[in-house]
């Protein structure tokens, strides 16, 4: 969280679309597991100026290397609706909707503030801390890219953790 400005997700169908596009354009054949960040970068790049740089981090790579068609056939055989259409209609566990056009690929923002609060909540839960000092407060503020006053407010008001020394 310390270095994140934004956290986005994409739909499965969009990843399959990018995987196939990469195979068609570059002749690169690999499974979609490594192309999740590529799909997000593709969507974000469409909104950026030519001279801007995008940095993406793949959060999951299985190295499975499965061909995407095998995965889509497996999904179909297990009752998943696999079709072309609007990826926004995709429902996890029910459907994989592959875009009909590259413009349909979108990055969907997750609420970073919610993730940051969850991070603090997990720290409190796992450590069972009831009080933190100023240096710990400063560390947490840097860790989640918030001011010390914001972190103090969250810790005291939402998690009943006392912040001592100022």
Regions found by a protein language model. Give the residues of each.
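A short, acidic, amphipathic alpha-helical segment used as a generic capping/interface helix at domain edges
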Residues: 12-17, 22, 36-47
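Long, compositionally biased intrinsically disordered regions
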Residues: 164-165
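Catalytic phosphate/nucleotide-handling subdomain of diverse soluble enzymes
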Residues: 39-93
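Active-site/ligand-binding loops adjacent to catalytic centers
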Residues: 1-28, 71-153, 158
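Flexible, glycine/charged-enriched surface loops at secondary-structure junctions
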Residues: 26-37, 50-53
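Generic beta-strand/beta-sheet core signal
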Residues: 10, 31-33, 57-59
């Amino acid at each position: 969280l310390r270095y994140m400005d934004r956290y986005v997700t994409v739909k499965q169908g969009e990843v399959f679309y990018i995987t196939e596009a990469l195979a068609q354009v570059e002749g690169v054949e690999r499974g979609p597991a490594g192309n999740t960040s590529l799909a997000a970068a593709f969507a974000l790049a469409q909104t950026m100026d030519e001279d801007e740089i995008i940095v993406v981090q793949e959060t999951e790579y299985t190295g499975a290397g499965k061909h995407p068609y095998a995965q889509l056939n497996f999904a179909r055989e297990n009752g998943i609706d696999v079709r072309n259409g609007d990826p926004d209609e995709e429902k996890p566990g029910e459907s994989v909707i592959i875009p009909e056009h590259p413009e349909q690929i979108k990055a969907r923002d997750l609420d970073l503030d919610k993730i940051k609060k969850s991070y603090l909540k997990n720290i409190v839960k796992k450590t069972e801390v009831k009080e933190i000092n100023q240096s710990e407060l400063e560390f947490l503020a840097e860790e989640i890219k918030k001011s010390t006053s914001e972190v103090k407010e969250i810790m005291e008001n939402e998690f009943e953790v006392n912040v001592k020394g100022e």
